[in-house]
Amino acid sequence: MLSVAILAAGKGTRMESSIPKVLHKISGKSLLQRVIDSCVELNPDQIFVITGHKSKEVQESIPDNKKIHFVIQEPQSGTGHAIQILCREVKKNEGKLLVLNGDVPLITPETLKNLLNLHDSKNADVSLITTKKKNPHGYGRVFLKGDFIERIVEEKDCNNQERLNLLINAGVYCFNWENLSEIISTLQSNNNQNEIYLTDTVSMLKNALSLEIEDNGELQGINNRIQLSKCEEIIQNSIKEKHMLNGVTFINQASCSISEEAEIGKDVIIEANTHIRGSTKIFNSCVIGPNTFIENSNIGLHCEISNSTVYDSQIMDHIKVGPYSHIRPKSKIYSYSKIGNFVEIKNSQLEEESKVNHLSYIGDSIIGRSTNIGAGTITANFDGQKKHQTKIGKNSSIGANTVLVAPINLGESVTTGAGSVITKDSKDNSLAISRTKQVNIDNWERKKP
């Protein structure tokens, strides 16, 4: 039986934040969720997330999972205290117990599996991950005696000689839970921190083993924004390298960010300062950017999107968007259409070969095939209480600076006069025009201020 305990009770004072440390995000996913995801790959029987500071907020951040249980640690009196509470609350302390911190987002399932395999192969009481650091400041030092761990001394309890030891404790343990439960209650807070250390169990158990791995950044804990930024960079580099090997070109890739869920086709060019978020899918041969933000959207073949934002929408094939366009949620732009500069589209459908080239707002609308929307066109869709729909048939031409007051339905091949305010439906093949007569007053003299 395999159980996992994730320590996530701390406040994270050095983050200088009102957000619990484990809820800070890297590439759109919290530190805690990343640790949970790695642990789920081990197929454990149960996962215990030990919370404390803002416990409700932490618990609500985790999607429902029958295997995940929450244990509250109050007060937060150290890692050993957290496991003392866990052992008291769980009736059956049996099998293996994997313990790790909730702030090690780069830990991989492969490393955790290697630790479990070592533990099983040597029938150990406790096994833990260690690594050698050139600058071990802040980490507990691990002291070996032959093949076994003799003791662990926390940084603040080390003397000058002990601080010279470069082998550090990564804070990832695998225990024989039954043996651990027999000694865990005896731990005391006799140290400079006045906390109960889980590391004290190592010297109390007979068979303590070390899995030493290379210091490749995987074990980096997050205690401040600098470390958070470094982990973000590591993950982003990994994501972008994967896409580049699959045929994607990045122009100034350091300025771009890509979500892990995003799918990007071959021969796509991602220009500078472009950010792809959520479950976005971009098909082959597109040019995205520069200065573009796309979230949870599908972008078809041979599209060009520059200096624009696209949220929760579908852009089909051979479409140009931008510069400075804003495609808002629930919009669908069909193939060979064009969305030009300073255009906002919201909850609307534009069928094939439609064009909205300049300075327009299209909201809650259905625009027919091969329809041209003139510069400055506004769909007035809100009456102060609710939104209304605008429908325009195919092959229509909406004149510049037209206001379409919804609800309204214009037929096929309808033309509207420039500067019109259209409030009534129009039939197929009609001209709709509504404007006051121009009056010219001769010899007009402007009043001077």
Swiss-Prot record:
Any single biological process term in GO: UDP-N-acetylglucosamine biosynthetic process
EC id: 2.7.7.23, 2.3.1.157
Cofactors, names only: Mg(2+)
Residue sites binding UDP-N-acetyl-alpha-D-glucosamine per the record: 7-10, 21, 73, 78-79, 140, 154, 169, 223, 328, 346, 361, 372
Residue numbers binding acetyl-CoA: A375, A418, R435
Enzyme class at the top of the EC tree: transferase
GO cellular component: carboxysome; cytoplasm; membrane
Alphabetical UniProt keywords: Acyltransferase, Cell shape, Cell wall biogenesis/degradation, Cytoplasm, Magnesium, Metal-binding, Multifunctional enzyme, Nucleotidyltransferase, Peptidoglycan synthesis, Repeat, Transferase
Region of interest called Pyrophosphorylase, as start-end residue ranges on this chain: 1-225
Catalytic activity, as annotated: alpha-D-glucosamine 1-phosphate + acetyl-CoA = N-acetyl-alpha-D-glucosamine 1-phosphate + CoA + H(+); N-acetyl-alpha-D-glucosamine 1-phosphate + UTP + H(+) = UDP-N-acetyl-alpha-D-glucosamine + diphosphate
Recorded superkingdom: Bacteria
Sequence positions that bind Mg(2+): D103, N223
Annotated region (N-acetyltransferase), positions in chain: 247-449
Region feature (Linker): 226-246
Cofactor note: Binds 1 Mg(2+) ion per subunit.
Alphabetical list of Pfam families matching this protein: NTP_transf_3
Active-site residue list: H358
Main location (coarse class): cytoplasm
Transmembrane intervals: none
Pathway listed: Nucleotide-sugar biosynthesis; UDP-N-acetyl-alpha-D-glucosamine biosynthesis; N-acetyl-alpha-D-glucosamine 1-phosphate from alpha-D-glucosamine 6-phosphate (route II): step 2/2; Nucleotide-sugar biosynthesis; UDP-N-acetyl-alpha-D-glucosamine biosynthesis; UDP-N-acetyl-alpha-D-glucosamine from N-acetyl-alpha-D-glucosamine 1-phosphate: step 1/1; Bacterial outer membrane biogenesis; LPS lipid A biosynthesis
UniProt-listed InterPro entries: Bifunctional_GlmU, GlmU-like, GlmU_C_LbH, MobA-like_NTP_Trfase, Nucleotide-diphossugar_trans, Trimer_LpxA-like_sf
NCBIfam families in alphabetical order: glmU (TIGR01173), PRK14360.1 (NF010940)
UniProt subunit comment: Homotrimer.
Family stated for the protein in its record: In the N-terminal section; belongs to the N-acetylglucosamine-1-phosphate uridyltransferase family.
Function: Catalyzes the last two sequential reactions in the de novo biosynthetic pathway for UDP-N-acetylglucosamine (UDP-GlcNAc). The C-terminal domain catalyzes the transfer of acetyl group from acetyl coenzyme A to glucosamine-1-phosphate (GlcN-1-P) to produce N-acetylglucosamine-1-phosphate (GlcNAc-1-P), which is converted into UDP-GlcNAc by the transfer of uridine 5-monophosphate (from uridine 5-triphosphate), a reaction catalyzed by the N-terminal domain.
Protein name according to UniProt: Bifunctional protein GlmU
Organism for this UniProt entry: Prochlorococcus marinus (strain MIT 9312)
Gene that this polypeptide is encoded by: glmU
